[in-house]
Structures are given as C-alpha cells and as structure tokens.
Amino acid sequence: SAAGSFGNFGATTDNNAGNNLDTLFAGPRPDTASTDGVITKASVTWTPNDNQLLYATFSEGYRPGLLNRPGGATNPAGTFTVPYAIDTDDMTNYEFGWKTDLLDYTLRFNGSVFFAEIERLQTTIFDPSITNLFFSDNAADAEIKGVEGDFIWAPPSMSGLTVTGAFSVLDTEITRVITPTNDVTLGDSLAYA
C-alpha cells in the first residue's frame, strides 16, 4: 500500500507506518515444503465368464505438504499457533467392484464398494481470531465408506431406447481431531464428500 511503501520514507525505523511483517511473524520460517516416500497399488481381477469381471484393489495416496503464509500467528489464548509447514496427508483405500453384461448384453451394470482411511487430513481453516488469512493444517483423521454404480439398459423390444443411471452413497466421519478448531468436530461428516 502507499502507506506501507512511502510512509516510512526518511524514517529512522521501518515500522513507522504499519506493521513490520518480519516482527509480526518472527521465527524459523521454512521456504520449501518437501515430501518423499513410497506409495503402493495392487489389483486382482477375476473373469468367471464372458459377462462378468470382478476386481479388488488396494491403493495408497497422499497430498504433499505445503507452506502457510500466516505461519506463526497464534490464537488470543496462545494455545494454538499456525504451523509454518504442514505434513502430507495419507489415504489407504480398499475397493471391491464388478463389471457385468446381463440379459443377453442388453443391460450393463458396474459398481463398487469401498473403504478409505485418511490420516492427518489437510484442511483449510479460516479463523479470524487467529489471522485474517486462510491457513491449512493437518486437522483430523477420517474414514470414508461407500457404494457406487452405474447402468446402461437398451431393451431389445424398444429399438433406439437407452436408459442410463448412476448412484453413489457415501458415509464419511471424522474419527480423530488433531487441530483444535470449531471447523473440525469429532464424528462430523467430511464437507463436500
């Protein structure tokens, strides 16, 4: 801003017209976030006949760690400090699924059931009592259970007609709270899941 850029012109201190960010957020601030490790994925498929395929999958995934702009900001009670860098969050997924052609290949029905565990879930938090900027933290552990499927039906008695549909049912839950905030509560569902 003009006050921050020119308000200190000729002043003997650099905090004459506003806040000196070096003083506000003093401390060891990393300038990089790095991640290393190994993730695995394994799948098994079985085709009992020409019309069916069954599969099972085990997979792992993660989102890399990241830096927080307002790292070092604290809440009024001094009990929480925004971390400068946050860790990866890790997901382990178990899935069983099927792909079928039924009724003389006029009905295709695909689906899956799955269970996923997330550790150290990265969450974006806005708490103006701490800072007026969004920040991220490893806020919780969570579980996701679900079933999903889709179908395509082309009845032979009605040439040109195709009926399609899909469904998805999710049950999500926060199983452990790591960051003390009102945005993340034990037992709540995951947002936008």
Protein language model regions, located:
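Short clusters of hydrophobic/aromatic residues that line enzyme substrate/ligand-binding pockets
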Residues: 62, 67, 86, 121-122, ...
